[in-house]
Amino acid sequence: FKPGVVSRGYGASIAADEVREVLSDSSVLEVGDEPLMLKLRVGCPIFVSPTRSLAVKALEAQGCDIVITDDGMQHYALARDIEICVFDGERKWGNGHLLPMGPMREPLKRIKYTDFIVMNGADWSSSIKPKQAALRMDLEASKLQSLNSEQSLPLSNFSAQKVNAIAGIGNPQRFFNTLVNHGLLVESQVFGDHHPFTQADVCFENGLPLLMTEKDAVKCRQFNLSAAWYLPVSAKLSDDLAARIITSLKSKGWFNG
């Protein structure tokens, strides 16, 4: 397979009929923080557009034969062959209500019609049963990467140290908990998801090392920070998940190998 990714490019200034390729030197203002983070991590072709079908066509022109649409379940203008629904295992479905009264974008019963359910950091615990048994994934983090150099250090090197930690993601407490669970003494500061960081946001007078998420790092690498680190995380997936996806692709005639 030659995979590619399409995304809305949240936070980017981009017209509805415009398509942009995400490059390793793209700016967050051009393509959004999450697409740029994905590009730097996986390297596959990535295009952003509010009209995702246009981004898909751009991937097709590059020879991609599998398209992953980032955060695309509710983008019904784009047809799909396989749906993978990922839940945050800590927050799950909250109070079960739809936005704005709760965290859900659709009723929980929607999972009866999705192909795969993946729980991030927990097991399935609802009486509503998905089409297939839910699978588990866990985020693993073991080393810190310097924001402005190639240096990396084991996270354990910072155990029992005081650090500043910032997070502008959907669930910042997960990041802070990871640091605390590794023995770090955290002075935390929360920002909104997709926060456009400024120099003032990342300057602290206490002289402590500054730690951030990988997503926030793509927005802070423009600043000249001498003691700043970010924490890359990797998803440890169930061995069964890849096999099930391949089986599903075969059943849809996408794979004959």
Feature locations, PLM:
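Phosphate/Mg2+-binding loops and adjacent switch elements
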Residues: 9-130
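ATP-dependent carboxylate-amine ligase
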Residues: 76-257
